Amino acid sequence: MADKKLDTQLVNAGRSKKYTLGAVNSVIQRASSLVFDSVEAKKHATRNRANGELFYGRRGTLTHFSLQQAMCELEGGAGCVLFPCGAAAVANSILAFIEQGDHVLMTNTAYEPSQDFCSKILSKLGVTTSWFDPLIGADIVKHLQPNTKIVFLESPGSITMEVHDVPAIVAAVRSVVPDAIIMIDNTWAAGVLFKALDFGIDVSIQAATKYLVGHSDAMIGTAVCNARCWEQLRENAYLMGQMVDADTAYITSRGLRTLGVRLRQHHESSLKVAEWLAEHPQVARVNHPALPGSKGHEFWKRDFTGSSGLFSFVLKKKLNNEELANYLDNFSLFSMAYSWGGYESLILANQPEHIAAIRPQGEIDFSGTLIRLHIGLEDVDDLIADLDVGFARIV
């Protein structure tokens, strides 16, 4: 299927007859105990328990295997581990490869829980973490240490949406610490708009809760990795008891079938909104990777095949508490909620000092209130009209 276009891959990935048993979709196989017909069958399952053979519920069922196979086909990986959420995927992927005395190098624009895991959990295990600017490129060599075991990327960055120069970073890391494991939180690109493993990254992690599920009604994380990382990542996750239920795996597989159509609409609508915002007199700047002038836009243009629905913009004005509540409380189409990636449009706000507080170096370069949008599948003109009315509330 690698020679087929993305939409064709998304429709067909993981849908072998072994997993569908004659239906269109993979079967939902809920099981803890899986029965062996004979002693020899038990021995066979035991020998092949890590290679897609039915063995025990914690190793997975046909439903899980179908999704894992699909993710490997889509991201070009040797294996895929499923986790109960994106944060679990990040934490357990890191844990699989570090030990006392190691060093983790993480972008300072990583998702806040990813940063907290390093600073609050890994620090107790004798693992140090330091941070790098997302636009550092080849200069990342200045932050590498002999004991650097993991380099963790997130592109675009959380909230402020900076795009890494991934080829420059990967080349620099390989030249200094060639055995380091390079990971990326690839959620924004849904694992398909940026093919991380093709760029030399070892582990591509997603909160599949977002675009893969696509309907804001299930939580799941994925980690797709290359051959050198697969066994260690797989076995660590198994020993840590990481798994998802069959129904969630099924919902995620079903979400893949419409992912291409949804992503195109997210791209088209979010870029139209971003372009409109860029011309608005109350907006200081727009952080959208596909918009010229956004930080790292040139790397997005070179390395990505599209964009999704999440971006942010900065107001020229810093809203006080009353103004902010009046602004956020009165939208008709934008809801306030954490997460994103569903069919619905969402809005949240951050004050500059709050963003500075969750950045390791505390550095930000704006003074107005930041607004984060997820542009859903509603008519884009209706969304722009709702935003336009919102601006009238904060004049």
Q: Can you say where each PLM-predicted feature lies in the sequence?
A:
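N-terminal "arm"/small-domain region of PLP-dependent enzymes with the aminotransferase-like
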Residues: M1-T61, Q69, I371
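Conserved PLP-enzyme active-site core in the AAT-like
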Residues: A2, L10-Y19, C80-H280, N287, ...
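C-terminal core of ALDH-fold dehydrogenases
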Residues: D3, L10-V27, E323-P360
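Conserved N-terminal alpha-helix of the aminotransferase class I/II PLP-enzyme fold
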Residues: S38-A88, P113-K120
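Glycine-centered tight turns that cap/initiate beta-strands
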Residues: G76, N147, Q282-R285, L333, ...
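PLP-dependent enzyme catalytic core of the Aspartate aminotransferase-like
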Residues: S119-K120, T128-S130, K149, R262, ...
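Short hydrophobic/aromatic beta-strand micro-patches
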Residues: V224, S312-V314, H374-G376
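Conserved small-domain helix->loop->beta segment predominantly found in fold-type I
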Residues: L271-S332, M336-G341, I355-G362
